[in-house]
Amino acid sequence: MKVGVPKEIKNNENRVGMTPSGVAELIKRGHTVFVQHTAGEGSGFCDEQYQKAGAQILPAIEDVYREADMIVKVKEPIEPEYPLVRKGQVVFTYFHFACEQELTEAMMKSGAVCIAYETVERDDRTLPLLIPMSEVAGRMATQNGAYYLQKTKGGKGKLMAGVPGVRPARVLVLGGGTVGEAAARIAAGMGAEVTITDVSLPRLKQLAAEMPANVHTLYSSEHNIRQELPTTDVVIGSVLIPGDAAPKLITKDMLSLMEKGTVLVDVAIDQGGCFETSHPTTHSDPVYMVDGIVHYAVANIPGAVPHTSTIALTNATLRYVIALADKGWQQACRDDISLRRGVNMMDGKCTYEAVAKVWGIPYTPLEPRV
């Protein structure tokens, strides 16, 4: 198969869809890999490394899309890429269709096979291609929350760890999944007082047993969240419904419960956000204020640490990329139900029910068509 790795063009997105070592694995299996010129530079990989791995370097993004049967990316195609995606082409990347109607319509119109990293789901409901970036995003969420808690950045002027005789900051983590756990661990390691919420009692029991002593668990309800907000300094939103829009756990009226300078970090923004007042921001302009509350809502948080993120992502995606290249997407999906669950679009049809429901479009089950 001909596999293409274009350069990401989303704002300050420095990750790349595949490392040179991943390319080498595909070449070893007889596939052809096209990498766009300088695609890996932001992650610390030069063209020469890809060439040594066996890739062919192409000068422009148009060339990569034209030559490739399958595109392997990091982030969803953005508007300049829409015309480049063609019927029958496999695009394997993070899509987050549930919060991008224009993208949804464009990919349906293209007739491409869109396989979303974030909805590849095992029988145990784990999301193997979301986990590595969730681990990065959770760690970064706490770091960014601490940074914007500084007075010069609009925050309260508190140190996360405090000092002897001075109370540490209080951090509220909404959602006890991979992002939330990572965020809570980093916050705890920094010395903050941490509360993590979830609706799953077994998950809360697990977190209570495994977390450091300065992390407390709390059942997630509107009442409990409202009770926590007046004394919280940093709120990290990390709730996820696979493939669907994130629930709004903090509404605009709840901002009045918080002290001015409280920092909200919405990691769920790529699924629409879990704060009513959230809207997507970028690494070049990451924060804004609403009623004196700092909002950080960058949709590609791991893009700020691209070397780590790219390696972690390739470690997770490579086995699926190999299966798709070796077998073709249809056979690969027949053989692996987790990969089949990742197919969101095909031949102009929406094959993922949650996305179809969000946008009110017809849902076409994939199984009879694979």
Annotate each PLM feature:
Residues 209-291:
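Rossmann-like adenosine-cofactor binding region
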Residues 23, 47, 104, 142, ...:
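Generic hydrophobic/aromatic pocket-lining and core-packing "Φ" positions
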Residues 2-106, 110:
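An N-terminal-biased, well-structured beta-alpha scaffold segment characteristic
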Residues 2, 8, 77-169, 298-300:
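Glycine/serine-rich phosphate-binding loop and adjoining beta1-alpha1 elements at the start
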